[in-house]
Amino acid sequence: MNAIAVSPVQHVGVIGGGQLAWMLAPAAQQLGMSLHVQTPNDHDPAVAIADQTVLAAVADAAATAKLAQACDVITFENEFVDLPALTELEETGVRFRPRPAAIASLLDKLDQRQLLTRLGLPTPRFLAIAAATATESELTALGFPVVLKQRRHGYDGKGTQVLRSLAELQQALQSYGDTPLLLEEFIPFEQELAVMVARSQSGAIATFPVVQTHQQNQVCRWVVAPAAIPGALQKAVAAIARTLVETVDYVGVAGIELFQQGDRLWVNEIAPRTHNSGHYSLDACQTSQFEQQLRAIADLPLGSTALQWPGALMVNLLGFEDHQSGYAELRQQLAALPGACLYWYGKTESKPGRKLGHITLPLSGASSTERAQQAQTMLAQVEAIWPNPDTAHQP
């Protein structure tokens, strides 16, 4: 945590009440800010830490107008919002950070791809399709395997499929009805990367270390910071992040996911909010992504994003069964691991693949090779306590 400045913003509204809003709480308290949350369920994680809660769907603009009455500024925990309605609210004086205009090209994956293309940034080839009318020539245009995505409202593996033949693709399309879809070229990457970037109202920019991420069933399983990539690639990733937030006049923290193959990069997706790949920063960086989010939207000086440890491993604690349990014994065992920083989101129901919490562990190795070996050892220790959803029920 940085030295505390007096913030001109005292009351922050957050649209969305999941764990990303919940993790804003310690930084908000340190910065002297109150948090007001709009979320549909009274058992959502952020309700427990909110100074005030508006119980309503995140796309309910009337509820957002009510939220705004108590807030100096409103930010976002997720992107499932009604953008035209928010734009109308902004015209009445409601202050959103980032502004609706800044996220307009980031909510729809087709708009993201078109933005990247206009900016000359590396992106997989893509094609917008409709399930009911797509022709065979369209479906085969990008070859196979191919990635099929919902253009909106897909997250944590929902709405994303890797398909290996025309028959598989045609079968998958039958379940989408008239949902707007995107076909993308499959990139045979060496590793997946991510970076968090913050931009303040005054235009200051800070990028966090580039990290390696590992996805399991399209859901982030673990993150290693920093990524073992050459300095030139680190600079290229930071340049991409800077270009994106400057171009759309973005204020706040955003996450950018990329593919890496040799010395080449492709932007996978852009998340206009704090992001799972940045959770390690809560303990491993001088400033967490959550403190940085609050600093950016309040136009306070951005904090240092430097690592406080040589490296870090963050492991998501994904649900491995349908159950209603707090898993107290397992959490106690995880917390006893050397250097462990454990976060439990307080969700009332476990489902396979659902994010229930995360654990961050320090890596002390002086080289990327040593840190990679440590990370594998620590991952095995975590999975000996908390089952991997893919192997939890194997004999």
UniProtKB/Swiss-Prot annotation:
* EC code(s) of this entry: 6.3.4.18
Q: Which reaction does it catalyse?
A: 5-amino-1-(5-phospho-beta-D-ribosyl)imidazole + hydrogencarbonate + ATP = 5-carboxyamino-1-(5-phospho-D-ribosyl)imidazole + ADP + phosphate + 2 H(+)
GO biological process per UniProt? 'de novo' IMP biosynthetic process
This protein's pathway reads: Purine metabolism; IMP biosynthesis via de novo pathway; 5-amino-1-(5-phospho-D-ribosyl)imidazole-4-carboxylate from 5-amino-1-(5-phospho-D-ribosyl)imidazole (N5-CAIR route): step 1/2
Show where the ATP-grasp domain sits: 113-298
Gene Ontology CC terms: cytosol
- Please, which domain of life does this record's source organism belong to? Bacteria
Respond yes or no to whether keyword ATP-binding is given for this record: yes
- State the UniProt keywords alphabetically: ATP-binding, Ligase, Nucleotide-binding, Purine biosynthesis
DNA-binding in keyword set: no
Q: Where does ATP bind?
A: K109, K149, E184, E185, F186, I187, E192, N268, E269
Q: Which cysteines are joined by disulfide bonds?
A: none
Q: Which GO terms describe its molecular function?
A: 5-(carboxyamino)imidazole ribonucleotide synthase activity; ATP binding; metal ion binding; phosphoribosylaminoimidazole carboxylase activity
Per the record, the similarity remark reads:
Belongs to the PurK/PurT family.
Q: Which PANTHER family match?
A: PHOSPHORIBOSYLAMINOIMIDAZOLE CARBOXYLASE, PURINE BIOSYNTHESIS PROTEIN 6/7, PUR6/7
Q: How does it assemble?
A: Homodimer.
According to its UniProt entry, the function of this protein is described as: Catalyzes the ATP-dependent conversion of 5-aminoimidazole ribonucleotide (AIR) and HCO(3)(-) to N5-carboxyaminoimidazole ribonucleotide (N5-CAIR).
Q: What is this protein called?
A: N5-carboxyaminoimidazole ribonucleotide synthase
